[in-house]
């Protein structure tokens, strides 16, 4: 079954979302979706790096299996991100947000309340991914994947200048949109 899944990815599938989440476990006898994705060199893997969805060792394992050029960091962030803990809705369902975690009333993870900058901090500080690699996975890789790397995803002449300046502790010091500093 998994062998068929792996062969079946072919050139049809280009991206896998929420690696390790809502899918069977990756095992040596039945590698499932994770095995199929790691076996398919043309498939990009989106991974939620919020500190809730995936343990730091699994983030490192994904990098070892797939390589940094195939990884895309996502936040799985919902609209309550940055707001106080409390009750909100997500897709018409009531969810409880506490810290960076959003759950249904039965405790099932419903999403994240973490922004992408916090995800980047997490993979650098907790999973041990280099800052350069983490930035690439949060900017360059997704821009290439959706076909807009000629406009965004890196700081280059002729590209839209959207970027943040951070200090050594990964705190945001300045934000630029279209080359103009904005006040946060």
Predicted regions and their residues:
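Short, acidic/turn-prone active-site loops that include or flank metal/cofactor-
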Residues: 1, 20-25, 77-79
């Amino acid at each position: 079954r998994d062998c068929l899944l792996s062969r079946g990815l072919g050139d049809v599938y280009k991206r896998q979302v929420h690696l390790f989440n809502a899918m069977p476990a990756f095992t040596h006898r039945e590698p499932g979706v994770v095995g199929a994705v790691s076996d398919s060199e043309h498939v990009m893997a989106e991974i939620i790096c919020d500190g809730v969805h995936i343990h730091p060792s699994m983030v490192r394992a994904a990098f070892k299996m797939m390589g940094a050029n195939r990884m895309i960091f996502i936040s799985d962030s919902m609209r309550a991100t940055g707001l106080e803990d409390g009750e909100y809705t997500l897709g018409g369902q009531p969810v409880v947000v506490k810290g960076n975690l959003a759950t249904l009333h039965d405790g099932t993870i419903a999403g994240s309340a973490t922004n992408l900058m916090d995800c980047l901090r997490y993979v650098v500080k907790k999973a041990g991914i280099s800052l350069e690699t983490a930035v690439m996975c949060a900017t360059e890789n997704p821009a290439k994947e959706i076909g807009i790397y000629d406009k965004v995803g890196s700081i280059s002449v002729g590209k839209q200048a959207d970027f943040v300046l951070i200090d050594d502790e990964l705190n945001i010091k300045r934000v630029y949109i279209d080359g103009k500093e904005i006040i946060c």
